[in-house]
Amino acid sequence: MRISQLEGKTVALWGWGREGRAAYRALRTRLPTQALTVFCNAEEAREIDALEDAALQVETAASAQALGRFEIVVKSPGISPYRAEALVAAAQGTCFIGGTALWFAEHAQADGSVPGVICVTGTKGKSTTTALLAHLLRAAGHRTALVGNIGQPLLEVLAPQPPPAYWAIELSSYQTGDVGRSGARPELALVLNLFPEHLDWHGDEARYVRDKLSLVTEGRPRIALLNAADPLLAGLQLPDSQVRWFNHSAGWHLRGDVVYRGEQAIFDTADVPLPGEHNRRNLCAVLAAVEALGLDAAALAPAAASFRPLPNRLQLLGSVDGISYVNDSISTTPHASLAALACFAQRRVALLVGGHDRGLDWHDFAQQMARQAPLEIVTMGANGPRIHALLAPLAEAGHFGLHAANDLEHAMGLARAALGQQGGVVLLSPGAPSFGAYSDYVARGRHFAQLAGFDPAAISAIDGLGVH
């Protein structure tokens, strides 16, 4: 559905975060007199009133009855379509779409293809991978957009001039389904990995996997690039796409610190500022994508050495009194915390875990702690007591020290005391979202930096967002 098709219909926007505001501006630019209603909270309603838009109404109660009055509801990604009020309204005929679907419909050609569009998704690593892809495409001399879930809504860059040669688009599981619903077919879709996440939004693990994979199953990209090492991806049948693989011995893969293409050693990653084996494996994914686009990936590989790591992702803030502080606030799953820990296997580490409870299973994390644990673990947040109870038997058996904190400030004090004069690493890798305590993971990372004695401004914006 293109924006022009909304003209004359009853249309509402649900959500007034950055995505909601981007949708409003895009619709207002194309449809300046279209009547719109925004469902938002009371504080946001006051902000909207200040716009003095006579064709814009505000409602603060998004009930099934209220939503059902509209033919079209443009929904922000964070609002689940599986909520009861959305399901009831949809059953009564309301069409729910996202800004991602509108953007893809606007850019699709007559046959549905969207040349130059590369979509990246996965449970972890997708932001760094998308940014690294844009970095290499720009290194090859191509004007490239770095947009999407990474920090710039697609509708903020609806029609940049001159248009980019490539679009590197990060998509969350909240957005992947929009691609197929738009009828558009990306040139390439890259799926890095799949672990359970966002179960509160999706409802259960099976639906999460289905929604995530809809990028390739329903989006039908020209090229589907998949991780051969992920069992949930290895068995996929995608008859409408050319399927390519990374992390496979016949293609781009990692051996130690060296990237190989088949049996040919291509590039030593020792000088690449990508902490962790998982990030170096994702470099293989980027090189496979570049090659699939017809570029010389081997020649571009050394450009990865000039990539600037993203903030809040295994970000070393510095050291104070023998203790290094690492900000991995982006970590929202237990698997992400395990990947972060693996980067510091030989160090004295105090790990801070816990946050908003989405019901994720921490048993795999606990099993790994029985085999190779940090020196200390500090639990915090809404799911902190649940994690603490799961880890307590291992701590009592002497695998690690275990502490319970009321909040991040308390956790920092416990971590410092536990490391003592010998020093080590305080690693914030919560394995859980920040909701409830912070507005987002960036705010959590900034607070961590402040508590560690660093300027919160060190949690800088992501380099290269937008079209360059």
From Swiss-Prot:
Q: Give the molecular function GO annotations.
A: ATP binding; tetrahydrofolylpolyglutamate synthase activity; UDP-N-acetylmuramoylalanine-D-glutamate ligase activity
Pathway given for this chain reads: Cell wall biogenesis; peptidoglycan biosynthesis
Q: Where is ATP bound in this sequence?
A: 122-128
- Assigned EC number: 6.3.2.53
Q: Show the GO cellular component annotation of the record.
A: cytoplasm
**Segments traversing the membrane:** none
Per its record, the protein catalyses: UDP-N-acetyl-alpha-D-muramoyl-L-alanine + L-glutamate + ATP = UDP-N-acetyl-alpha-D-muramoyl-L-alanyl-L-glutamate + ADP + phosphate + H(+)
Keyword terms: ATP-binding, Cell cycle, Cell division, Cell shape, Cell wall biogenesis/degradation, Cytoplasm, Ligase, Nucleotide-binding, Peptidoglycan synthesis
- Answer whether the UniProt record assigns the keyword Cytoplasm to this protein: yes
Please explain the role this protein plays, according to its UniProt record.
Cell wall formation. Catalyzes the addition of L-glutamate to the nucleotide precursor UDP-N-acetylmuramoyl-L-alanine.
Q: What is this protein called?
A: UDP-N-acetylmuramoyl-L-alanine--L-glutamate ligase
Q: Which gene encodes it?
A: murD2
